[in-house]
């Protein structure tokens, strides 16, 4: 993957040179072996990425490979660099010893993420299932690219169930010819998502609620997309959305469920309509629309992306309704996983940390400042 992506490769030890020789040189740049002298100095320049294959680590003693590699190398990681460790899913381990070693990788990566975060660098763990090696192209390119700038300390699974094999993905305008639906597209994360997908070649259908026509239409004109105004909680919303997508575009390839609301109060002070609105917009409408799309509107090989939240994982003071709805989204994705795999489709939930949007701007100042500093990078993200 790295050779095909045009990396300027430095490898750990002479024996690793063969791997790059077999893959072919990266645009005429042969791999260079790294060595460390007795004083711990490395014969390599500042590096943008550090990648360690830990899939074969099977005991606590073998975890020393993490120290042996990262102890001398981490000091040479450049600003906004990338650290990636490859591992295996712990549930597939052949023994308790292997399971312990593979589980240890997650704690290591999360800690490294905090250590390198102050210079804008990130660290990720790719858990590659047996037989899924041919599917790592996309995930590995993503975590090493600028697209993952605000993703850090995360274990990411690579499954053998479905996916696109190495080399079959066009990396210039990869979404060319695709139709993408983005809900809540008028501003914030939704607008940024719509712009990115259009930049990568997709025709983006910008969906937002009636009342946001001006902002939504302006965005659609800017990116060459189209507009679909609908209240996602309306009883006929699933039918209206599906009919519009089929009539205008013949279906849809990508759906980003971004529309959401917050109605914050402690459970003791919360009005019932606050509870109902957060649950219905963030979870109920998402479920109904997804089920409708799967009845003939979503094309083969389709992709569902659901916006969850850190609040859905860890909970949050004054957000029982919001946290419940976003945890529900995660449960929905887990349910869909098996159902969609047989159709060549995928479903993933994204739980953003603190993103600077209109919603987070309404959070009290001290809570807002604390939230910005809680993640590995120690800062808020931009949509």
What positions do the PLM features span?
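Residue(s) in the substrate-gating loop at a strand-loop-helix junction
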Residues: 309
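Catalytic Tyr-X3-Lys loop
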Residues: 43-76, 80, 84, 98, ...
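Active-site loop immediately N-terminal to the catalytic Tyr-X3-Lys motif
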Residues: 96-97, 316-320, 378
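Alpha-helical segment proximal to the catalytic Tyr-Lys
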Residues: 114-115, 295, 338-339
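Canonical Rossmann dinucleotide-binding motif of NAD(H)/NADP(H)-dependent dehydrogenases/reductases
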Residues: 1-12, 172-205
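A conserved structural motif in NAD(P)-dependent oxidoreductases
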Residues: 128-136, 375-383
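Active-site helix of classical SDR
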Residues: 101-105, 290, 325, 333
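Conserved glycine-rich Rossmann-like NAD(P)H-binding loop of the short-chain dehydrogenase/reductase
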Residues: 7-20, 202-216
